[in-house]
Each structure stands twice: as structure tokens, then as C-alpha cells.
Amino acid sequence: MQNVLTQRLTNDEQQKTLKTLIEKNLEIKTMNKFDIENLDLYYGENQALKAINLPIPVRQVTALIGPSGCGKSTLLRCLNRMNDLIEGVKITGKLAMDGEDIYGNVDVADLRIKVGMVFQKPNPFPMSIYENVAYGLRAQGIKDKKHIDEVVERSLRGAALWDEVKDRLKSHAFGLSGGQQQRLCIARTIAMEPDVILMDEPTSALDPIATHKIEELMEELKKNYTIVIVTHSMQQARRISDRTAFFLMGELVEHNDTQVIFSEPSDDRTRGYVNGDFG
């Protein structure tokens, strides 16, 4: 009798644990990393973003698409306050990360560690492969060589680059191919353990083979990071993203699951853009 009761309790505990895990998994899937509400941005008198309302889900790839000058890169730079570096910029509205307004009383340097960025053109530092990845750690005052070695290897593995460079870590980063340099920049970013990785057209300067490797890498990275990517390639947005937001002349026309945006958009402007009628 006691064994039966014990077994029942064990089963009940297992069911309870399973329920908790399912609830947490659902919470991760439905949580937003960013909540953008009524966001306006001005460059002097010119309004570049107009009343943007956009949730960005956690641990998914969100693609920002639209013709040149539509505001997608401007919005991307809002997510880690890179626009602060531009004179005359004015921002109103709310942009919250994990519920905290990032334009409130926050440490901007800390924000930019949590929200890393990979730019259009690979920009490795003029130093060795190893030192590129270790640079941010050293800048934070970390001196433990064993710890730095571990982070460098882990980050290069995370960027799918370790096997290609492990025997030449002391070689200059400029000796890498363009695709390898871009993956090195991704490794440098994830070495700082961010929550979010922003990518501003990260494959536009790369050949198709290097582009494919970056896209494969993004599929792995989203298991641990929230990714927001600006892309001019409709095919790329369709391949890699979970959510897509379409911008036109500073306005967010619509956002939805990527499959919906490309197959059943609700706005004729979106339909025209994804069908190649303009752009």
C-alpha cells in the first residue's frame, strides 16, 4: 500500500514538474524582449519614424523589411540607443526591454553589452583573431587567461568558426575571408554574453556560400538570443525569420508571422512590396 502511495506521489510530482516546464516554455514563446509603443524619431525637423508600435518576441528572429530610407535601420539603432550618437535626434514614445524603458534612467554602456550589434560590413579590429574576441573581456578588466581562453573558444564555437581558426588564433583577423570576418564579429559580440543580437544587413557584402553559413548560424543562435535583422532580401527574410515587420516611409505598415506576411498580407502595400512591384 505504501509503495502504491509513493508511486502515486511520484507520478503527481512528475506531472506537476512537466506542467511547470510546459508553462515556462509557453511563457518563453509568448514573451516579448522589446515592446515599442508610439515611437517617433526626428532627425532635426525630419520625422524618420512615425508612431511605431511593435512587439519583438524573445528568442526568435524578427526581420525588418522595406525599401531604402523607410526607417528600418533607424529603428534597429533605437534598440541599443546607437541613434544617441547622432546630433539633433529626438525620440518620443516608449521602448521597453524586459519591461524597462531603455530611454529612461539606464546605463547606456551596459545596454549596448546586453544588445550587441553586427554591422553590414565586417569590421574586425586590426589585431589577431584571438584578441578580437578577447577585446571586450579585457576592456571590462578581466585578466584571468584561463577564463579568457574558455570564452574565446566558446564564442568561436558559437559562431561556427572554431574549427576553421583554432590552429591560427594568433593570425591577423584581416587574413580571414569576408564571411569568416563576419562570423568573427558575431563571436566578438556573443563573447560579451548579450541578450539580443542586432544585425544590419549582415550578409549584403558576402557571397552566397558565406551568406548560407551566416543564415545557418542564425538558426542556432536564436536558441539562446533574440535576433533582430534588417534585410533587403525578401528571400532571406522568408528563410530565416519567425516574424517580419514591413516599413514604408517611416511607418510600420504591418507585422506578423513571416509566413503570413509573405502569403496573406493584410495591406496592399505589403503585398506589392513582397511581390516585387516596388522597392
Swiss-Prot record:
SMART domains: AAA. Its EC number is 7.3.2.1. InterPro entries: AAA+_ATPase (IPR003593), ABC_transporter-like_ATP-bd (IPR003439), ABC_transporter-like_CS (IPR017871), P-loop_NTPase (IPR027417), PstB-like (IPR005670). It catalyses: phosphate(out) + ATP + H2O = ADP + 2 phosphate(in) + H(+). Residues 34-274 form the ABC transporter domain. GO terms for cellular component: plasma membrane. SUPFAM superfamilies: P-loop containing nucleoside triphosphate hydrolases (SSF52540). It is a peripheral membrane protein. It is found in: Cell inner membrane. This is Phosphate import ATP-binding protein PstB 2. It comes from Vibrio vulnificus (strain YJ016). Its main location: membrane. GO terms for molecular function: ATP binding; ATP hydrolysis activity; ATPase-coupled phosphate ion transmembrane transporter activity. Keywords: ATP-binding, Cell inner membrane, Cell membrane, Membrane, Nucleotide-binding, Phosphate transport, Translocase, Transport. Belongs to the ABC transporter superfamily. Phosphate importer (TC 3.A.1.7) family. Gene3D superfamilies: P-loop containing nucleotide triphosphate hydrolases (3.40.50.300). The complex is composed of two ATP-binding proteins (PstB), two transmembrane proteins (PstC and PstA) and a solute-binding protein (PstS). The keyword S-adenosyl-L-methionine does not apply. One of its GO terms (biological process) is phosphate ion transmembrane transport. The keyword Secreted does not apply. Part of the ABC transporter complex PstSACB involved in phosphate import. Responsible for energy coupling to the transport system.
